[in-house]
Design a protein with these regions (language model features):
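Phosphate-end processing signature that detects enzymes handling 5′-triphosphorylated RNA
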Residues: 1-183
Length: 185
């Protein structure tokens, strides 16, 4: 199990070009290549996972499939920290063996037969690595694409700052630095 600490900022699509040109991001080293991610989120028809603040997602990145389980996030001042479990998704079947919390795994196994796709996202992700000071490492991910549920569709455009190493306050400092130039956010 890992704990993800992140700050997500929803952006208007028109802000993307300026954000990419911001010196903080434009001069940062890239983490991998820009990729397209396809995600399907699952729940029961009664949305019981959502009710319990849990999520099950399958993600296709290139030719690789991953299954992710996330639990309720503790949100403090806009930062969210949540337990998550990730493992390969193979043979088009759910496998919750990586979930090391018995209560979560048992609940997922109970819901497993009734899990259905609820919505999908497809977006391009650009990732850079920010190291604002020694001992701090932040992934800055710009996502641009769509979210679809049934016949409905909406644009998805966000900046996600994920703390890999360091103090969570560094996420705020980076967001404030990006916001100083009003053209970028």
């Amino acid at each position: 199990m890992s704990h993800e600490i992140e700050l997500k900022l929803t952006l208007p699509k028109k802000a993307l070009a300026a954000l990419r040109k911001h010196p903080l991001l434009a001069e940062a080293p890239r983490e991998g290549r820009t990729c397209t991610l396809e995600n399907t989120y699952y729940d029961t028809p009664e949305l019981e996972l959502r009710e319990r603040r849990m999520a099950v997602r399958n993600r296709k990145a290139g030719s690789r499939w991953l299954q992710t389980v996330k639990c309720a996030a503790e949100s403090v001042g806009g930062l969210s920290a949540r337990p998550e479990w990730e493992q390969p998704y193979v043979n088009a079947s759910f496998d919750f063996s990586a979930v090391d919390r018995d209560d979560v795994r048992e609940r997922l196994e109970t819901y497993h037969p009734r899990l259905v796709p609820v919505f999908t996202t497809q977006f391009r992700r650009e990732t850079v690595v920010l190291t604002p000071r020694p001992g701090t490492r932040v992934l800055a991910m710009i996502d641009s694409g769509t979210i679809e549920a049934g016949e409905r569709s909406a644009a998805l455009c966000e900046l996600e700052l994920e703390l890999v190493e360091g103090d969570p306050r560094d996420l705020y400092a980076i967001a404030l630095q990006l916001a100083e130039d009003r053209k970028s956010v």
